[in-house]
A protein has these predicted regions:
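Residue-level recognition of beta-strand microenvironments
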Residues: 37-40, 264, 349
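His/Asp/Glu-enriched, well-ordered alpha-helical/loop segment
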Residues: 175, 186, 304-314, 321-344, ...
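Acidic (Asp/Glu)-rich catalytic clusters
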Residues: 221-224, 249-259, 307, 337-339, ...
Length: 434
């Protein structure tokens, strides 16, 4: 006789995301669906109807986690092309490139990853590339993605340099590796497994411009058994402006609950430590509020145009000035019973004005917060940065998550992966002030 449940999970500590505390309980699964959830211990009849029973006494059983800001396109750079992690000289490097070219025959650039600048000198490597590959673009990324070895052919075609090696500058190569099906199929599969192993089952993924064709692969995956990560993706305008035609097409194309278009994403100001965060009042011992101007008029125009068509925006802001300007913009968006209809968000929110947080909470803005970012620097470095840039008085409102929560904002965790790899324990620790 066929059993009702494919699996029953019994847990001493079950956290369902609805109740504030965990409790003893069990889950009954049929295939990939939870069909029953109850407190207490299961009756013998329930167990007899299960193909498999899992019993957890010390572990916490909980729903999958959502990371609200990930960047698979940047993560893939760690593994793109040939592996140069053990290369120490030009001869080895040239040999690996020749083998890769003969095996893969790429139409565009020859790509590589894992280069160690301490093992293989960049200048020597680039001289070899000019001699051996004068007519083929070559780009070899360092192990941490912060720089690269490249030839002049690559500089001319892709319009960036080893000194400006960051995603927004090398976006022109993304179409090539995102459409390399042999590479991307395994890479995205490994990415999903890595995220699942960390408890993540849903991501809000950033894709530059029109995602350079990667949505074709997502469409193929949508109803596949190979999809283990719900993917809600946003368009971040980089090589072109906001594209509402593309947005409409994506909204029509993805209508299920596994993959969906989620709107637009954009950076506004920069970090406060670099004096590029936009402040309401000048920096300590300075006469300016931000080193670089922020095009708020352009941002407002895009946000209101997208909002008119019911698309979301997520704006990345770090200074209280930037957060304040975004607050003003969001107040002009469509509302239903006083709350934003399209659930716009602000990312990071490093330093904020409590008055703005109250308004943001009142209109229903979501905060996408990089909790783990506090792990990147020692506490004394962070404290000194705050003292030097905004001072101790304003510093009271740095990472003011308590006020965000009290004001009614919806707080969500993000990593900007691969800046940080999602860690639930670290996120909990740092979100509570660790």
């Amino acid at each position: 006789m066929k059993k009702r449940f494919s699996k029953v999970i019994i847990a001493k500590h079950l956290f369902d995301g609805i109740n504030e505390k965990d409790y003893e309980g069990y889950l009954c699964l049929s295939g990939n669906h939870i069909v029953e959830k109850k407190a207490g211990k299961p009756e013998k009849d329930i167990l007899n109807q299960a193909q498999e029973v899992l019993n957890f006494r010390d572990e916490l059983v909980m729903p999958g986690i959502t990371d609200t800001h990930t960047f698979f396109t940047g993560y893939a750079i760690y593994h793109v092309g040939a592996d140069f992690s053990k290369v120490t000289d030009n001869e080895e490097g040239c040999c690996i490139l020749r083998k890769y070219e003969q095996k893969r025959h790429p139409e565009g650039a020859l790509l590589g990853h894992g280069w160690n600048p301490e093992m293989w000198d960049r200048q020597n490597g680039e001289e070899m590339l000019e001699e051996k590959f004068p007519n083929k673009a070559v780009i070899i990324f360092s192990a941490d993605r912060s720089c690269c070895i490249m030839n002049q052919k690559a500089r001319n075609i892709y319009q960036f340099s080893a000194e400006t090696c960051y995603p927004e500058s090398y976006y022109r190569i993304m179409r090539e590796y995102l459409n390399d099906r042999e590479f991307i199929k395994k890479e995205f599969s490994d990415y999903m497994k890595m995220m699942n192993s960390r408890g993540v089952t849903t991501v809000k993924e950033m894709g530059f411009d029109d995602f350079y064709g990667f949505t074709d692969y997502l469409k193929e995956l949508e109803d596949s058994e190979d999809l283990n990560l719900r993917t809600f993706f946003m368009s971040q305008p980089v090589g072109e402006g906001m594209n509402l035609v593309y947005a409409r097409r994506m909204r029509e194309q993805f209508t299920g609950n596994k993959i969906r278009f989620s709107g637009f994403n954009r950076m506004t100001d920069g970090t406060i430590a670099s004096y590029k965060g936009d402040l309401k009042e000048p920096y300590e011992n300075q006469d300016f509020c931000c080193k670089d101007p922020v095009p708020y008029e352009e941002i407002e125009k895009d946000v209101l145009a997208a909002d008119a068509e019911d698309f979301r925006w997520s704006l990345h802001a770090q200074g209280d000035g930037a957060v304040g300007k975004i607050t003003e913009i969001y107040q002009k968006c469509k509302k239903v019973q006083g709350k934003l209809k399209n659930r716009h968000a602000i990312t990071d929110m490093e330093f904020t004005d409590p008055k703005d947080l109250e308004i943001l909470g009142r209109i229903g803005v979501t905060a996408e917060l990089y909790f783990q970012i506090m792990s990147l620097d020692p506490a004394d470095v962070l404290i000194n940065n705050i003292k030097q840039t905004i001072g101790t008085e304003r510093g009271k409102y740095y990472w003011n998550r308590r006020k965000m929560q009290d004001s009614g904002m919806n707080l969500s965790g993000a990593t900007d992966l691969p800046l940080l790899l999602t860690s639930i324990p670290e996120s909990i620790y740092y979100s509570c002030g660790g």
